[in-house]
């Protein structure tokens, strides 16, 4: 057997194995291997395909890594209209729908029929087209007749099979070359939280659905891949006739066999009582799911009857969506606090009489800005209705005016900063008030320090809120540069800071100097500059000097920047406080330049997130980190689903237990040494 044949077989086997593990992870939710082991399989496949490009196929899982830039999304016409479902918030209207369907069926001579009940995902509707089993097109719903072709972006979703196994389809005449799958793209709650944490405060998404819609419109498929979207399938079209697949339940089962995630929480309901039970059960249990669901979809189970019942111009008559009313509770506005963010924005926060809502106790709620207080007509001591819908944080939606107490009083708008006493400013055409004293306001200093130390910035884990508050209150730190001037005795004198804690912080600060230039740019906390923008700026301007000397016009041409961000960047570097901070960071050992990819000794840890816990005998923590980086890896400070391997030394901490719970591979120091 020739070498080429052996290589082809190895590549095909790798693809099968990777696709199998993708299905286990995204569809069945029972992974067999850690992320590290999966990444190694993918890296091996990419390596072989680069060496043997003739063996690359359109359905290779290596295409999921993204990277292609799409300048525009052409329109495509749907083969059948993507109708939206009529929806209701009323169980009585669901019962009316059920009765109406039964009457229509009686006219057709059909007495009893089951309804298929499925969870309604709060996402973005998508159509996938497979030709001879290969994914050839993915499109948004658009206006129902035409949508945007976003195939490149959808190929990055691991829950979208690039090829479906035709052998799993029923052996029935009439199946066409083109098979259509419809469903919903969504973002899990954890991934949504991670995405928002990496964005500037003023650019964060309100809820997972907004984040999903925004992500699918991105022109950079690499960024789409990094945001970890998911796809749930609920519709299958095999032919123009299609009635040989007799039930919707059968379709969902077949979709699962084809490798699609279907939500799994679907069932058949024989009568209105079972429908009501299903809706009632998930009204409570949906909060325990890892993704947002906002209702239940009911469909006549017998697909053959769908055309006989028909549809209106907008929606089918054989289906309805019951949407859960937003969770609401009545409580009392006890006060309004004013928070000052790291950029000086003053945000009013409602202080509420504690009340249970959506499975948790709520005592505070954002009021967004002072215009919102005026719009609501809100007064202190009012009874208010708070609501939790798709938003992460509950919001006040209205005042119960007929229950307004006699002691109600207006909410005063502060004229000075609640933290530093500076006179507040309200820029023209903006709704928020700002504290202009960026250099001295304690709240802004604390906010900037916490951002500088956050996980996606320099990841200084030992630097938490209480410690930052002490450092600022005692005048030890006024900007991030002062952190690197701290001494062990100063730290030991602080509350709850013994010798070991002080040592750990100094070590974490030392290690933070090794973080990349782009992460440092993000850590600076420039308004409107999130992780992606910081990455583009670092690539365009390889030194801080070059970046601060660039004109606004030049900055605006950088991908992901534009005029608003360019002005913000230029304004930031024009301040004397910024220049002082940069001098301190340079003196602390930060190179303040893009060093490019480190020269690798080998690629044994390429693309792997490595975490160390416990004490190592052969190496100090910094030396061990450098060994990983010299082999293409990245050292992280916390355990997550993206951690590839944990190196456990003597006396490991709680991170080891968490790693084992998540199924992350754990190795000893000897095994680590052997991998070098």
Swiss-Prot record:
Sequence positions that bind NAD(+): 35-39, 84-85, 118, 141, 184, 299, 323
Cofactors named for this entry: Mg(2+); Mn(2+)
GO molecular function: DNA binding; DNA ligase (NAD+) activity; metal ion binding
Highest taxon listed in the record's lineage: Bacteria
Active site residues of this protein: 120
BP GO terms, sorted: DNA repair; DNA replication
Protein residues bound to Zn(2+): 417, 420, 435, 441
Keyword field: DNA damage, DNA repair, DNA replication, Ligase, Magnesium, Manganese, Metal-binding, NAD, Zinc
Catalytic reaction equation(s): NAD(+) + (deoxyribonucleotide)n-3'-hydroxyl + 5'-phospho-(deoxyribonucleotide)m = (deoxyribonucleotide)n+m + AMP + beta-nicotinamide D-nucleotide
Annotated EC: 6.5.1.2
Disulfide bonds: none
Ranges of residues in domain BRCT: 600-676
Gene3D superfamilies xrefs: 5' to 3' exonuclease, C-terminal subdomain, 6.20.10.30, BRCT domain, DNA ligase/mRNA capping enzyme, Helix hairpin bin, Nucleic acid-binding proteins
Function: DNA ligase that catalyzes the formation of phosphodiester linkages between 5'-phosphoryl and 3'-hydroxyl groups in double-stranded DNA using NAD as a coenzyme and as the energy source for the reaction. It is essential for DNA replication and repair of damaged DNA.
NCBIfam families per UniProt: dnlj, PRK07956.1
Protein name (Swiss-Prot/TrEMBL): DNA ligase
